Amino acid sequence: MRTKLPMDFPISKMPHLPSLPVSLSFLLFFLMLVRYWKNSKGQGKPPPGPRPLPILGNLHQLADGLPHHAVTKLCRKYGPVLKLKLGQLDVVVISSPEVAKEVLKTNEINFAQRPEVYAVEIMSYDHSSIVFSPYGDYWREMRKISVLELLSNRRVLSFRSIREDEVWNLVEFLSSSDERTINLSEKIFSMTNDIISRAAFGRKCNDQHNFTVLLEEIMKIGAGFAIADLYPSLTFLRPLTGVKPALMRIQNKMDKILEDIVTEHRIKRKAAANSNIKFEEEDLVDTLLNYAEANKDEFHLTLDQVKAVTLDIFSAGSETSATSMEWAMSELLKNPRVMKKAQEEVRQACKGKSKIREADIQKLDYLKLVIKETFRLHAPGPFTPRESRERCEIGGYTIPAKAKVLINLHAMGRDPTIWTDPDCFQPERFQGSSVDFKGNHFELIPFGGGRRICPGISFATANIELGLAQMLYHFDWKLPNGKKLEDLDMSENFGMTARRKENLQVIATTHIPFQK
């Protein structure tokens, strides 16, 4: 039986109930807490990082200076696993060898994918190159071709005479410079381009200057920090930024050069077949075409794919070798003690010779330490990019699927917890050390690591060793216009590689005359 309140029951004696707005506010707050808890639980433990702004994310924190320098500062603050929001992208930055090993080795299949970059999509013939193709059957086949056919140790050795010829051409030019100021950066890049051209195409490229200029433009815009990459869903922005027309202009010019090269090879091969002539020497384009012909029933290699791989070899091989030589010479000039020690070693080991051959390089232990130290301070690319295929745990943090992961080589090379006096150029730090740069020691991985490690390590190293040895053997070096060594500008540029901001201008004085 229900109890009724008497009509004269005073309202003041009724229990106090919250008002409707207060109740709704409390309910809304409670629901937000529940949602936050569910989202947090679903995300696991995200890596630490600065609070992002709407729309921009953390882009404003990379605007001051070079992106890899700004990211390294944030890594120092937040730790070896850093989370950033760059536009619409979730980016995780790894800056310790231990966590890099988790990404590149322990979980290498999950991180075998490279993130999509709009410029690369256009320039690599829709991701048909070895470097940028998606992880899968096509990539595995192309990787096999590169390791077994294109860039094997046997094939790299077969290009020895090409390397020696082109390095000697550089030495000849320097010998005739008569102590004038030389743009050494330009000459080094020209030399490496000639080496790669002859190895890849069988001759120097007829459009060498245009080809080099186009490569430089690709390196500048292919780093993955363009508006089209940071806001991938906003496709309407691409025409507005002018990136697409610029990319198409570069791609059309580059395609014309590559098309002519491949067509020339096909005509030459057809003529040889009609005359029953067997090639004594094959360049890399010949090797690709041979493979395509021999395996056409199992693996169809299109013309665009041949061009993509050819461009891959040329751009990666030339840029890596030249950038590393340029930085090595810069550091040697900046550090005369190291320069003197390296010169004394090569001049003693090759005493009495009018020129150095590649076989002499094996005696030059200190030169190899110089190259290691150059890779530590100046990795050809400041970041090694990967993408997570599935959600996983890395370094104690949850990495979502499709996250862009950057291995920060710039930060690891300058980490005081890894290296003593990390900002000093001291090749002796590697004396007696087993640390190499071939992907086995994650504190020094200038060529990456895991199954997507750069297949051209041997090729690049051979170019760098011979080029540096010859320049140190034959010449003494100084800066022009009486400039002091401490005034040498060591500023970097940012792109797919981290080249010097300013070209290296030097004066070379002949110490040991050269005879070809």
UniProtKB/Swiss-Prot annotation:
Transmembrane domains' residue ranges: 14-34
SUPFAM superfamilies: Cytochrome P450
Pfam families: p450
Membrane topology listed for this record: Single-pass membrane protein
Keywords, comma-separated and alphabetical: Heme, Iron, Membrane, Metal-binding, Monooxygenase, Oxidoreductase, Transmembrane, Transmembrane helix
Cofactors (names): heme
Tissues/organs with expression: Mainly expressed in roots and, to a lesser extent, in stems and old leaves.
Gene Ontology molecular functions: heme binding; iron ion binding; monooxygenase activity; oxidoreductase activity, acting on paired donors, with incorporation or reduction of molecular oxygen
EC number: 1.14.14.-
Enzyme class of the recorded protein, top EC level: oxidoreductase
Location within or outside the cell: Membrane
Main location, first listed in the record: membrane
Pathway, per record: Secondary metabolite biosynthesis; terpenoid biosynthesis
Residues the record lists as binding heme: 454
GO annotations of cellular component type: membrane
Reactions catalysed according to its record: dihydroniloticin + 2 reduced [NADPH--hemoprotein reductase] + 2 O2 = melianol + 2 oxidized [NADPH--hemoprotein reductase] + 3 H2O + 2 H(+)
Functional description taken from the UniProt entry: Monooxygenase involved in the biosynthesis of quassinoids triterpene natural products such as ailanthone, chaparrinone, glaucarubinone and amarolide, allelopathic degraded triterpene lactones inhibiting the growth of other plants, and possessing antimalarial, antifeedant, insecticidal, anti-inflammatory and anticancer activities. Catalyzes the conversion of dihydroniloticin to the protolimonoid melianol.
Similarity comment: family membership: Belongs to the cytochrome P450 family.
Name of protein: Melianol synthase CYP71BQ17
Organism encoding this protein: Ailanthus altissima
Upper taxonomic lineage: Eukaryota, Viridiplantae, Streptophyta, Embryophyta, Tracheophyta
Gene designation: CYP71BQ17
